[in-house]
Amino acid sequence: MLTLDKIYHAKFILKQVARKTDLIAAPRLCPGTDLYLKTENLQVTGSFKVRGAYYKISQLSAEERAKGVIACSAGNHAQGVALAATRMGIKSVVCMPDGAPIMKVESTKRLGAEVELVKGTYDDAHDRAVELQEQTGMTFIHPYDDELVIAGQGTIGLEILDQLPDVDAVIAVSYTHLRAHETE
């Protein structure tokens, strides 16, 4: 179960890799309101996804680390997994759809992952990653449907509260999926 304690633990672990990104005022986007943008595009991999991938991988057992990790992604999660695994000395394989942006594919390789381009869509890459996970015993690092990944990504909320304690609302948009998760 996802708890606030897990998110605080993730914040502690992520100090070694994630940048505390700025909140910048954006008055022209919505005149008459105090609107701020969280600049996660300035994160170490250009996306918030590194937060979840790094925290999840940091919590693996020695046995899981020895077997390596596998993921599927069209780019941002791929880079987060590659960076995290490489920094921790863990083998990583990322299945990416063959239509993924070449810049994301090359960046994922430079960050240390073995990339397998899969003909078709994201769903095809996901199916291939699951197949490889079953064959190899590597740990599958899901891009969003994992409480440790969510805890890592949830550290953004803690930063927002530190930077803007009187915040009224937070609107979070994710390209991959928009999900609401409840914490205790």
Each model region followed by its residue ranges:
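Positively charged, low-complexity intrinsically disordered leader regions
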Residues: 1-64
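Conserved active-site and cofactor/substrate-binding residues in soluble primary-metabolism enzymes
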Residues: 2-5, 9, 21-24, 45-52, ...
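Glycine/charged-rich beta-loop-alpha catalytic/anionic-binding loops adjacent to active sites
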Residues: 31-42, 61-68, 136-144, 163-170
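Active-site cofactor/substrate anionic-group-binding motifs, chiefly glycine-
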Residues: 40-92, 96
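Structured catalytic cores of enzymes that bind and process phosphorylated ligands/cofactors
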Residues: 50, 54, 80-90, 103-108, ...
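Small/polar-residue-rich loop-to-helix segments that shape phosphate-bearing ligand pockets
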Residues: 93-94, 98-173
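Single conserved hydrophobic/aromatic residue that forms the stacking wall/gate
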Residues: 177-184
